[in-house]
């Protein structure tokens, strides 16, 4: 009986772990989900953004004490403007999505919300990590050898 309980706990912990994408795996997935060239943003820029926002980790979160918001998932989408975590004061929820949906291994919801973010006037510049690490840089290395 004890062995079954331990096995159950191990299996439970495996199911809640986030996925850390390999660079090319992410590039292929983002391409399939329609991000390559979306709103004029190249696939390499999206992969660069994900690298510096989350390290390609779907389960990444970052709490921002200044405004009591949290960034979620592979693109670190913020609960102040884009998703609903039920905790952020004055949240907008422009993507009409639960923030927990942005932590799934299947990143379709995260991509859909990222498309919403990049559709705003600020575009890809909404992401600080993109401005700091990808803007005006040769980002071709992020898709090199990926066959995309």
Curated annotation (Swiss-Prot):
Q: Which GO terms describe its biological process?
A: defense response to Gram-negative bacterium; defense response to Gram-positive bacterium; digestion; killing of cells of another organism
* Cross-referenced PANTHER family: LYSOZYME C (PTHR11407:SF28)
What is the recorded name of this protein?
Answer: Lysozyme C
Q: Which gene name belongs to this protein?
A: LYZ
What is the uppermost EC class here? Answer: hydrolase
Further comment: Lysozyme C is capable of both hydrolysis and transglycosylation; it also shows a slight esterase activity. It acts rapidly on both peptide-substituted and unsubstituted peptidoglycan, and slowly on chitin oligosaccharides.
**Family annotation (CDD domains):** LYZ_C
Provide the function of this protein: Lysozymes have primarily a bacteriolytic function; those in tissues and body fluids are associated with the monocyte-macrophage system and enhance the activity of immunoagents. Also plays a role in digestion in this species.
Catalytic-site annotation from UniProt: 53, 71
Keywords (alphabetical) are: Antimicrobial, Bacteriolytic enzyme, Digestion, Disulfide bond, Glycosidase, Hydrolase, Secreted, Signal
Its family remark reads: Belongs to the glycosyl hydrolase 22 family.
Q: Which reaction does it catalyse?
A: Hydrolysis of (1->4)-beta-linkages between N-acetylmuramic acid and N-acetyl-D-glucosamine residues in a peptidoglycan and between N-acetyl-D-glucosamine residues in chitodextrins
An MF annotation (GO) of this entry: lysozyme activity
The keyword Signal is annotated on this UniProt entry: yes
The protein's location, in the record's own words, is:
Secreted
One Gene Ontology cellular component annotation?
A: extracellular region
Oligomeric state and interaction partners are given as: Monomer.
The catalytic activity of this protein is classed by the Enzyme Commission as 3.2.1.17
Show which residues constitute the signal peptide: 1-18
All disulfide bonds of the chain are 24-146, 48-134, 83-99, 95-113
Superkingdom classification of source = Eukaryota
Q: Which InterPro entries match?
A: Glyco_hydro_22, Glyco_hydro_22_CS, Glyco_hydro_22_lys, Lysozyme-like_dom_sf
